Amino acid sequence: VLLKGDSIVAVVDDAQLRDYAPKQTIRLPGKYLMPGLWDTHVHFGGGPELIDENKQLLPLYLAHGITTVRDCSGDLPDTVLAWRRQINAGQLEGPTIFTSGAKLEGIKPLWKGTIEVGTPQEVTRALDGLQAQQVDFVKITENTLKPELYLEALRQARERGMRTSGHIPVQLTLEQMADAGLGTIEHQSYLLRATTPREQELTDKVAAGTMTGKEAMRESLQSYDEPTARKAFSYLAARGTAIVPTLWGSRVTAYLDREDHTHDPALQYIGKGLRATYDWRVQRAAKDGPEAIAQRHAQFEQSAKLLPILQQQGVSIIAGTDAGFLNSFDYPGQALHDEIGLYVQYGLTPQQALQSAVINGPRFLGKLDRYGSVAAGKAADLLVLDANPLQ
């Protein structure tokens, strides 16, 4: 494998090596070479006072073999855009960053670092601004964003040729989101709604205000039907809507009642300020009674079991972790290894799990000409391994 600068020049057999005069030769007998890993759902944030702690996460990703991250919006969008530029220019050490910039939300949302939109005209202005920043995709969340404006944002983004990622509003079905052109669904638990024959009924009740989202989730779990799930996932695949599972972060939160993370070795790599942002989920989970805890467990397990069905129905599974601030004990770097380990545990093959972390991310972003394999013209983002990851 011949490298020049940040690119692979050629992949040749030994007999062809005499055509080249390398300045340096690295011999790796008995080792395995593969493309760098991608974590396609990370966050940087916690306020301006935590910029330095977030910046320290960049080499941590590299130390775990993660050469590319997709930033799904925190509350430091301008800082991340600057890092993207500096890393691309070779001025900052870190993984290649693809970012959404600030996410779209409704008026006065829970989340910080958002562009608040309340009218179609404001959606237009927001997308104008994001395009001017040359963001890599548009992130949309549903805390206070009106469902009709969510669909409007997807429509306008698709007209502009902008890729989209988002959460699923409780007032809309997955079919509606796929029809509107949503590129990736972030967090696999959202798919549970589409696994019941009662999806439309439950969605309508939530939209009418006669049922809460949590109640609808409980009803969805109780009325799970695999043929319905397969039909829904085939629909997503046909529309080109992918899934970023973020299973590891979901698992950590689901089992906070059973597992003590206060002595995790990975905590030593997380700054004190970022560690403090973990508290809110821990404190919220501590207030759950036995029934709520049981639902947390059931929701995670049922969600995770959908993974092989998604694969079988042709949905593109893109590895992402939700690592970063706020998401308790979901450690940048390590989390991706835990994530793809769960993919195998819940039914994917090692090869499929690796494809989710190497090939499917660049495919979503239209970057397979540069990433996803060890081949001429691709980025020289390479990992050297002691063992065969396919085994």
Task: Label the model's feature ranges.
Residues V1, D6, G30, W38-H41, ...:
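Divalent metal-coordination and catalytic microenvironments
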Residues L57-D78, P95-K103, Q131-L145, M162-S165, ...:
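Divalent metal-dependent hydrolysis catalytic cores, especially in the metallo-beta-lactamase
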Residues D136-E186, P227, L247-S250, Q299:
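Divalent metal-binding pocket/active-site signature
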Residues A102, G106-R163, T210-S223:
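Active-site gating/metal-coordination segments in enzymes
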Residues K31-Q91, P109-L110, I115, Q121, ...:
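Metal-associated gating/positioning segment near the N- to mid-region
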Residues D13-A15, E301, Y331, T349-L354, ...:
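Acidic, glycine-enriched loop/beta-strand segments at the rims
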Residues A126-T141, L191-Y346:
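Active-site neighborhoods of metal-dependent hydrolases
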Residues V1-M34:
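Histidine-rich, glycine-flanked metal-binding segment
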